[in-house]
Amino acid sequence: MPLPAHVYKILTPAAWQSCQGQPRLALGADDAQFIHLAEPDQVNRIAAKFFSKEPQVIVVELDPAKLPGRLVHEANPGGATLYYHLYDGYLPFSAVTGVKTVNN
């Protein structure tokens, strides 16, 4: 399966601020086993479900070719919808191709 043009990571504004000046993006506890990423049409739904207490979220666009690790397109356990998960890797700032603030 070819790589998508972009994948997206959703961060809280606080997480985004905390990683400024660092070599990689900040990750949350939910990213311990693998890093959760999204396709464009999944961003709003994921933000509403998992970031409902945040009035705004930061959506970071990433070039998947610049992500170290294994990018896997798979369903969450017990689910049917496919998501991108990055195993054995991290999100370097060098992979960031765009950033936008989205009202949630």
Functional labels for PLM-detected ranges:
Residues 2-104:
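Conserved, structured core segments of small domains
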